[in-house]
């Protein structure tokens, strides 16, 4: 496994309920506040929260020091169509939603999953990424893990604070092992300390491409997930403008081009 790549600490980014609850109060903006679109246009800058350590989605290029990746490219596409420039604010994942609620940035473009729980606190653009949960197993694995229920009595590695952790813990009998970073659970998988790992299908392809460990892709074991741009509630003009920007990028093929560049497939459309 290549050990030099940045720390992909989480699969497709979903916070635990407790973390979400801490940022509910600051999210509610006064009714009379200006729409975010007017604020951003006047400023000429869209402040974008992202982790910056999650390749190939968002990471700092070691050669240039600039933020790069799929999310960063999507952000630049949106900003170009809004007529503003992007300003990236690197934020640790556990604090990223709270930072949005506190106004540290205008949006999050960092693989934030669209869930009913999150919609109670934030608004979202239309989805710009679609993927699904997928297992990683040892190369010589003979057991047939076709669904999560097949892992009852087995040890499953997941990312801390991820939707995959929640999904795994919802299945009685799975011995769920939580890890702060993907490299650790893949090492444990290769050496037999866990029986499988669960991650996002797009991330699985990236991890395997950059790993020399004796592991391989397993079955997809869940529904398709949708990722969108998150922002504070009460900004209908901004939401319409961002959705229009994404629709235009999808229509002219530029969003697909960015996805192909990073993943080799078009992850911007539902399968």
Feature roles, as predicted:
Residues 33-111, 120, 252:
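Extracytoplasmic small-molecule ligand-binding "clamshell" domains
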Residues 130-137, 201, 205-247, 265-271:
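Periplasmic-binding protein-like
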Residues 46-47, 83-85, 102-110, 154-155, ...:
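Alpha-to-beta junction loops
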Residues 139-155:
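Flexible hinge/capping segments at coil-to-helix
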Residues 163-176, 215-218, 246-271:
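Ligand-binding clefts/hinges and TM-proximal coupling segments of bilobed small-molecule sensing domains
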Residues 58-64, 75-84, 147-148, 161-180, ...:
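Ligand-binding cleft/hinge of the Venus flytrap
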Residues 95, 112-121, 167-170, 190, ...:
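A ligand-binding cleft/hinge motif common to bilobed small-molecule-binding domains
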Residues 72, 88-98, 143, 162, ...:
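Short helix-initiation/N-cap motifs at beta->coil->alpha
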